[in-house]
Swiss-Prot record:
The keyword Cytoplasm belongs to this UniProt entry's keyword annotation: yes
Highest taxon, organism lineage: Eukaryota
Presence of the UniProt keyword Lipid metabolism in the record: no
Taxonomic lineage: Eukaryota, Fungi, Dikarya, Ascomycota, Saccharomycotina
Protein name: Putative truncated L-serine dehydratase YIL168W
Compartment(s): Cytoplasm
Keyword tags: Cytoplasm, Gluconeogenesis, Lyase, Pyridoxal phosphate
Gene source species: Saccharomyces cerevisiae (strain ATCC 204508 / S288c) (Baker's yeast)
A GO molecular-function annotation: threonine deaminase activity
Length: 127
């Protein structure tokens, strides 16, 4: 079975009656994505397109580096796993251990640096 970097997720029609309005609206269940959020679509698309470009230019396979507080790193890791690409994610010290384990379980190398995402991102850009 071929892995993909995103899943087609259901769009569920819901009714809201809060005393002020009676409205129908739609909820997209993006939490069912491999990375658990909508970020799997955008980041996965960017990685796929960038890898195709690198291959067509003869640069070889892409290696992916991401800074993240959690969800973007997990999306990058799951996309890279589906495309057999190496991935490294820099997260700040404030990232929950559970998220670090998820990113690692998706196959990425995790580097913990900085007190917040900005410091993790700065480290990635200059290392």
């Amino acid at each position: 079975m071929e892995m993909t970097y995103y899943e087609k997720t259901p769009l569920i029609r819901q009714f809201l009656n809060n005393g002020k309005t009676n409205s129908w609206f739609y909820v997209k269940h993006e939490m069912l994505q491999p990375g658990g959020s909508f970020k799997s679509r955008g980041i996965g698309h960017l990685i796929r397109k960038s890898n195709e470009e690198a291959l067509s230019e003869g640069s070889g396979k892409l290696a992916v580096f991401s800074s993240s507080g959690g969800n973007a790193g997990l999306a990058a890791a799951t996309a890279c796993r589906s495309m057999a690409l190496n991935c490294s994610v820099v997260v700040p010290k404030t990232t929950k251990p559970r998220m670090v384990k998820k990113i690692q379980s998706a196959g990425a190398k995790v580097i913990i640096h900085g007190d917040h995402w900005g410091e993790a991102d700065e480290y990635l850009r200059h290392e």
